Structures are given as structure tokens and as C-alpha cells.
Amino acid sequence: SRMVPVINKHGGVVDKFPGDGIMVMFNTVTKSDTYAADALRCVDDMCAACVAWGKEREAKGEKALELVWSVAAGPVVFGAVGDTTRLEYTVIGDSANMAAKLEKHTKEEAVHGLTTKETFDLAVSQGYQPPTPRNTLKTRIVGGVDEPIDLVTLVE
């Protein structure tokens, strides 16, 4: 419930809550010419909210949560998937799959957030200015991706 207002602020729409995650879409329900920048700004603000939440938890003697983030931009199909017995609205496509693969890949890179260099460059061209310097990770092998790709850290 803490993240949804942040997501809404940046024009994102929650697709689903798979397991302990949140799948968010940009530029699907509401058109945006800055969708990649919106997504990365959203991650920045969610990270800040998580830091504050972690401090609250630690003040109560609870453990802060360790969260990870991934962002991939590209075309998706948005709509109903399934049949008459089970129908679900969702997004499918290469960028949705890439985001899932990047989320898993954060462990290999020992970081808390990743995006593709292509998505990062698109966000910058849309006006995104990272609040802290980002590191580019060249020619990384990501499980399930055919060719090596360049990545950018979102959260170290």
C-alpha cells in the first residue's frame, strides 16, 4: 500500500502483485511521451520511500526489507489473457519478459536495481536526470537473453 501512491504519482498502473513483487505498466492505460523517464523516476521515489519505511521498521526493532527493481521499455500487448474459466488482464511481450529477467539478474550483479542501457538512454532523452550517478555494466549475460546486453544500475 505504500508503493501504489508513488506509482500513481508517476502515471504508472499496477498490473498485478506477483508473489512479493509489483508489476507496473507505463504508457498503457494513459498515453505518455515520457514513459521510460516516468518509470525510472518512479523507481527513484519508491526507493526513497523504502529507505524511510526501513528506518521506521528498524526503530520498532523489525528488519528493514531488501527490495529490488527492474525496468525495461518496449512494446507490449495489454489485454485479457485466458479463457472463460479464468480471465486475467495483464501485459505480455519482450519488455515484460526482460524486466522479469533483470529482476532475477540483480542477484548476479549484487545490486538492487537494473535496467537496460537502451531503456536508460531513452529515459534520459525523455528528460530523466538520475539523482545519483549510475553505473553501466557492459556486455552482460542475462539468463534467458540470447545476446549479451549492456545494463545500467538503478540502485546499488
Specify the residue positions occupied by each region the protein language model found.
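Alpha-helical scaffold within the catalytic cores of cyclic-nucleotide enzymes
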Residues: 1-12, 28-69, 73, 94-104, ...
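A short pre-motif secondary-structure segment
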Residues: 14-16
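Helical mechanochemical/support elements of P-loop NTPase systems and associated helical scaffolds
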Residues: 18, 35, 77, 91-98, ...
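Short beta-strand/turn "edge" motifs
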Residues: 19-23
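Short beta-strand-to-turn element immediately C-terminal to the catalytic PLP-Schiff-base lysine
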Residues: 25-27, 154
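Cytosolic regulatory/linker segments at or just downstream of nucleotide-handling modules
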Residues: 76, 105-156
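Cytochrome P450 core scaffold surrounding the K-helix E-X-X-R motif
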Residues: 80-82
